[in-house]
């Protein structure tokens, strides 16, 4: 998918880029695969902000995407490539041989009219989903399950992929796009290929309003807040933060502070961390 550049007719158009949607073949979504969703603006059931910088945005309908791919040995034909406002990747509309319709993440190279299949006996080609034990070493994969049957959780964003490096005992060794190498059960499923719409990272919003349409609110620096709002706040003019280390809004040291649980059970499944030289 290409990138469309705009002429600087206004300040908001200057440097603005957008997808040209050349891969999209159907503009209206499949009604049977839609669900409503409510926006909570980052609040929990008590009304407290649990995720900052969220709120507003355009109304959207959720597309029911199949991340499990458990309809085995039934071939499906790609009927359309569609836009999904809820994710960076495009989605593909499948129609199975028995008439059932489904959405999946659209991998790079998948086109209308192609056939895909899932199951242990499926061919090693783009869009097919198989258990890791049936995928050859060196294959590029995406939509990887962490728990068999739960559905894909890794490598789902636009342009991302992982590579199967090897198999050891009951585990597969997988290298993620972040550089992390981890073990995944061989009974977990993955889809062949790279997630499509890889040009997404080159898109420039151009103006703040376009970001607000996505439901993202401004991120304000702590140094320009009042001292009762942030540890960095207060002072006369541009004042230093007044602490030996940068702090979070809740008074915790934040620069380089590890937030992952040191006792997490999944630590033993990480062979190499995503940061060079760190485990």
Swiss-Prot record:
Pfam family, one: Ribosomal_L2
Compositionally skewed regions (Basic and acidic residues) per UniProt: 23-33
Bias-annotated ranges (Polar residues): 8-22, 34-43
GO biological process: cytoplasmic translation
Molecular function as annotated in GO: rRNA binding; structural constituent of ribosome; transferase activity
Keyword annotations: Ribonucleoprotein, Ribosomal protein, RNA-binding, rRNA-binding
Organism domain of life: Bacteria
PANTHER family given in the database record: LARGE RIBOSOMAL SUBUNIT PROTEIN UL2M, RIBOSOMAL PROTEIN L2
Assembly, per entry: Part of the 50S ribosomal subunit. Forms a bridge to the 30S subunit in the 70S ribosome.
Record-given protein name: Large ribosomal subunit protein uL2
Gene that produces this protein: rplB
